[in-house]
């Protein structure tokens, strides 16, 4: 006959085993809940989740396109061409600031006080290893140079010499790069070289919702020493390519069929 002490020991041992198993089950349950919630947020995040992420990453989340003005074809004039810079930044102290990539890996605002000292003195190196969000390597015969997409520097290399920096690169069309942005970058570059003055320069990629490809970029510029008389503009450059239909959510594209 089992003694009372042996019986007590057996009951205690069984209780410990049950408690241990129950503890493991509770941990497993908590882990499953975490996995389910995380998966839900990752695959099905809605507008409320996006708004929350905007609050968490206010300095790096690129805003939607909300302002429109006079349409000039490759670009749109914003706010009567008046940029919106803080007075405290209107100094002759050069700087560069780049936003962190947001929760989708997209580049955000790039901001600089550009002077001759920031400009490059060497040739630009290859940036082919960098693939910004929405990137696809695809060719069309109707696109000059064939390739639809370029790696666009938000602040052009000729202005600050910033090259292999993923915080300063987005996926843009050939048309946006060479027709849309280049003329404004060259205007600023030529002005600085001729006057040795400073120019405040800010480029803001505009994404609609959770699109991986920017709809375009807002570019603002203001020359410091002459209070904007030399350079002053506020424009939106469209990320488009004539004859090509683009899915800005993914970066996919297709040739527009000729209806004629």
Regions found by a protein language model. Give the residues of each.
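Domain-level detector of nuclease and nuclease-like folds
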Residues: 87-260
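Hydrophobic membrane-insertion alpha-helices, especially the h-region
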Residues: 31-45
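Positively charged n-region of N-terminal signal peptides that target proteins for export
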Residues: 25-29
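N-terminal, intrinsically disordered, polar/charged segments of Gram-positive cell-envelope systems
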Residues: 47-95
């Amino acid at each position: 006959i089992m003694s009372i002490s042996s019986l007590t020991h057996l009951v205690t041992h069984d209780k410990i085993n049950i408690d241990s198993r129950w503890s493991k089950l509770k941990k497993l349950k908590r882990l499953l809940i975490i996995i389910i919630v995380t998966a839900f947020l990752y695959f099905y995040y809605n507008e409320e989740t996006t708004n929350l992420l905007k609050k968490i990453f206010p300095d790096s989340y690129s805003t939607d396109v909300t302002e429109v003005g006079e349409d000039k074809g490759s670009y749109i004039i914003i706010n009567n061409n008046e940029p919106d810079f803080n007075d405290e930044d209107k100094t002759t102290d050069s700087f560069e600031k780049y936003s962190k990539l947001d929760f989708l890996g997209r580049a955000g605002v790039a901001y600089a006080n550009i002077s001759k000292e920031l400009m490059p003195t060497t040739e630009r190196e290859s940036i082919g290893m960098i693939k910004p969000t929405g990137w696809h390597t695809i060719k069309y015969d109707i696109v000059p140079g064939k390739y639809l997409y370029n790696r666009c520097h938000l602040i052009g290399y000729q202005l600050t010499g910033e090259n292999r920096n993923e915080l300063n690169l987005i996926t843009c069309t050939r048309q946006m790069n060479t027709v849309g942005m280049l003329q404004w970058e060259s205007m600023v570059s030529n002005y600085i070289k001729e006057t040795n003055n400073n120019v405040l320069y800010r480029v803001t990629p505009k994404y609609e919702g959770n699109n991986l490809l920017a709809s375009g970029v807002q570019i603002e510029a203001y020359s410091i020493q002459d209070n904007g008389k030399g350079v002053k503009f506020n424009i939106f450059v469209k990320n488009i390519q004539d004859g090509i239909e683009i899915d800005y959510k993914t970066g996919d594209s297709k040739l527009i069929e000729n209806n004629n």
